[in-house]
Amino acid sequence: MAEITEVRIYKSKGNGSVKAYASVSFDNEFVVKGLKVVEGEKGLWVSMPSRRMKDGSFQDVFHPVSREARDKIVDAVLKAYQEQE
């Protein structure tokens, strides 16, 4: 997997379940924007960038294929978020 070289956190304003947005840079060559840090019933989790389809459903714009890659991204985003608390 590409190395995560930077994570930027943008705190959300308001009291909704979305606590922050994040962008993740890989290998200092490309960036994925629009990840969300969401507070749910079981704690914080990270939502991958998605868009709403005409039928109202959501489709991921970016998502890791392997569990290992997903865990690496989620861990990096949550760590960066918690460091800003």
UniProtKB/Swiss-Prot annotation:
- What domain of life does the native source organism fall in? Archaea
**Keywords for the protein's UniProt record, in alphabetical order:** Cell cycle, Cell division, Septation
The UniProt entry, under Pfam families, shows: SpoVG (PF04026)
* Biological processes annotated in GO: cell division; sporulation resulting in formation of a cellular spore
InterPro entries linked to this entry: SpoVG, SpoVG_sf
Q: Which HAMAP family match?
A: SpoVG (MF_00819)
Would you identify the family this protein belongs to, as annotated?
Belongs to the SpoVG family.
Role noted for this protein: Could be involved in septation.
In its UniProt entry, what is this protein called? Putative septation protein SpoVG
Name the source organism. Archaeoglobus fulgidus (strain ATCC 49558 / DSM 4304 / JCM 9628 / NBRC 100126 / VC-16)
